């Protein structure tokens, strides 16, 4: 049985409240779970101690027997020191312009440098 540590939504409309639960990966998000290990109340301010309540011993136990936390909980557990902080891969290609645009920018920079040199020599 594949186990997940995930958030199960509760609360009213526009007033979310989450239970941190250990559940079978095939179970519905808000459905049957094995154990409740904490709560998360996003309506409270970030510095409030009641925003995240966690039974760290039980989380460590479930992680040791192979339960996989969701991405959101991995970030939270990393802040608490329960798991290693996930490594984010750098995006190397996406932010760079295409080759033609890079060539155009390089040519424009050369023209600007030549114009600046001419202006400096003319003074």
From Swiss-Prot:
GO biological process: translation
Stated family: Belongs to the bacterial ribosomal protein bS16 family.
Organism: Paramagnetospirillum magneticum (strain ATCC 700264 / AMB-1) (Magnetospirillum magneticum)
One Gene Ontology term of the molecular function aspect: structural constituent of ribosome
Biased composition (Low complexity): 93-102, 114-123
The protein's name in its UniProt record: Small ribosomal subunit protein bS16
Keywords, comma-separated and alphabetical: Ribonucleoprotein, Ribosomal protein
InterPro entries: Ribosomal_bS16, Ribosomal_bS16_CS, Ribosomal_bS16_dom_sf
Gene Ontology cellular-component terms listed: cytoplasm; small ribosomal subunit
Annotated SUPFAM superfamilies: Ribosomal protein S16
Bias (Basic and acidic residues) ranges: 104-113
Positions of region (Disordered): 86-123
Key word Ribosomal protein present: yes
Pfam families: Ribosomal_S16 (PF00886)
């Amino acid at each position: 049985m594949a186990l997940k540590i995930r958030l199960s939504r509760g609360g009213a409309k526009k007033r979310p409240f989450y239970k941190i639960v250990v559940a079978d990966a095939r179970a519905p998000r808000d459905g049957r779970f094995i154990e409740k290990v904490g709560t998360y109340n996003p309506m409270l301010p970030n510095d409030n101690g009641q925003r995240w309540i966690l039974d760290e011993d039980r989380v460590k136990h479930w992680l040791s027997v192979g339960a996989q936390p969701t991405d959101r909980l991995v970030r939270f557990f990393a802040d608490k020191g329960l798991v290693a902080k996930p490594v984010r891969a750098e995006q190397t290609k996406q932010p760079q312009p295409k080759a033609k645009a890079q060539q155009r920018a390089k040519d424009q920079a050369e023209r600007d440098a030549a114009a600046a040199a001419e202006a400096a020599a003319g003074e």
